[in-house]
Amino acid sequence: MFKINNTFINGSFIQNNQKTYFDLINPSSEDIYGKLECTSIQNLEKAILSACNAEEECANLSIDNRKNILLQILDGIIERREELAEIITLEMGAPINLSKNAHIQMGIDHLKNTIKILDNYEFETFEDGYKVLRVPIGVTALITPWNWPLNQTLTKISSAIAAGCSIVIKPSEFCALSSKVLAEIINNSDMPRGGFNMVNGIGSELGPIISEHKMINMISFTGSTQVGINIQERAAKTVKRVSLELGGKSAHIICDDVDLNKAIPNAINQCFINSGQSCSAPTRLLVPEDKINEIKKIAINHVNTIKTGDPLSNETALGPVVNAKQFNNIQNHIKNAIDSSCELIVGGIDRPQNINKGFYVKPTIFANVPENHPIAQEEIFGPVLSIITYKDIENAISIANNSKYGLSSYITSNNPEVAEQISKKIKAGQTIINKIGRGAVPAPFGGFKMSGNGREHGVFGLEEYLEIKAII
């Protein structure tokens, strides 16, 4: 059994005087594989002070030095990618191929893209009679989730380093091993001593202190909408910048001109990737009402081909969800939908057949779901899809926008012009047209409405960590 200490301050892993531990549980077996030593409040204060003391040195790093640090981190990730993939599979149950080809690769791509941006980004521009400087915002607190652990941490860290900011990161306690490897990699880079600090423990204990702290200039948070609201309320006392990437209930509009035998399986796969544990997952599938019967048959047949099981097997497409809390929450959503007479066409409550342990959820689809039903409105964060019928495209757009969230949207159409016109009417931070996955990494990512504010990735992600200063 591992005992993990992830309290990394001023260039060293340090002990916590008051020992509090968090059990690390393998979601595929429910066995405890390790214990995380939680960061004490005293050491959290030390981490923030360390970042504050390193603020000026980080800000004064040349662009070449910032690029070199990012290149060193990139090399470290690539060198340890097999190890990291196995760790992510252990921590959150992601199928090993997904860990390698998505979890790790997306983080690598973000690093490469940020390095490329620094080749041409202008931190100083001359306007008509004045100069504009883009300067580091200062001490940044980065709070990252468990669902895409390495991708989310590298997205934020790469932008903060590129901007010249010092960092205190609080990764998810469920991802202690991958976080430790990342800290080791950054420690082997030329990052200024104290410029990168990590605290690890229960979010509800550390989060309020981070949110209210006077020495922290910015918080970048990815997680649930309710926690994001709590952070923003507490952060308002010090008027610090808060960038929030929160929940979603994304719609996927299937137009009536497509090959359903291709479009429906692709839509289901997109929804169920990472066991449905993605804030941008297209969990509402909007289809023409006159084709619903055909679509149901295709959906049932496809779900029955999805291999659920051991995440270390190359054959597995769907692993467990991350923990018992998530499993029970998803089961409750499914049960409530069944009890309220939603049309269950495949899946349902309990584990898949022949799986007796682990936090495995049956891939589940409901059809003819009323657009205002909780199963079509609440973020479930599991492999659960709601199929909703529409009368015409304007009706589809109305249904897509009938959500408190606005993170992402998807369109499948054989007519690019029609798809683009639809996309302009959808209230979401991004629209993905005829693609499996997010598409271009540099594209900005962030939400409308209760899906958050601010943007990550590419130039827009870098600029979240910069202040604008005019010299006249």
Predicted regions and their residues:
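A short acidic/small-residue loop/turn micro-motif
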Residues: 15-22, 38-42, 258
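ALDH superfamily catalytic-core signature
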Residues: 226-370, 433
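Conserved C-terminal structural/oligomerization subdomain of aldehyde/semialdehyde dehydrogenase
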Residues: 29-35, 216, 307, 353, ...
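Long amphipathic alpha-helix in the N-terminal Rossmann-like dinucleotide-binding domain
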Residues: 49, 67, 71-82, 94-120
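Rossmann-like NAD(P) dinucleotide-binding subdomain of oxidoreductase/dehydrogenase enzymes
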Residues: 123-262, 390
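Hydrophobic face of amphipathic alpha-helices that form TPR/SEL1-like repeat modules
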Residues: 1-28, 114
